[in-house]
Amino acid sequence: DDDLDARVLEHIDAFFAGLPAAGPDHEAATRGPWWFFLSEKVVAITQGRSYFVWDIKVGRPARVLSRYVTRTPAGIGLGSPFTMQLAIQEAGLPRVLYASAGGAIGKVIGRKGLFYELVGNQINAIDGPTEYSAYPSNVSAKLAPKDPDAVAARLSAAIRERVPEPWRSTFGGTVIMDANDIGRNVLGSDVPGDWTRFEEMFADNPLGQGSQQTPMAMVFLREDTAQA
């Protein structure tokens, strides 16, 4: 967690230190309200909730259940024995079996996502290894970050202590985002109210899904357009 805070503040400091030299266009673009966005994957890694696949002891239930999961080009989901094993460890085998039965019924009646509704525990945020991901994500599987709301609040407090005015006053808070090329979901934030607007801001997945290695973003609301 300390390493995460230090990395975040390093980038925040560098951004505002370089802003005066960036010119009037950049100064104008940063006058409005702004938020700090952070990939949930980075939070999970710093919490020790990411595991190399060779360290995950896969049981028979995980091997069997993972065969029935629909895979998409945007991510492996629970369609891997490794990610399914993490789901079982996180939620418990009885609950995963219960949710699997419900999910099967959901497919019959045309209701998508019933498995994740029933299993809970942010199992939908579990990620597995993909070829297009940068190391170590190409050889690891991870759980959702723990206590993401608390992490967001802690980072926001640290940012407010470091950011100069007037940006300190216009800072809205931190958003921990789970995004890929087919969807996005706010896992945690210290910003009150509806988080739908933040998911809409990330409709085109600006942090990327592959080798971009851009897990952080500062999003400013343009005063002249009222758009992020």
Where are these regions (language model features)?
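N-terminal and secondary-structure boundary signal
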Residues: 1-228
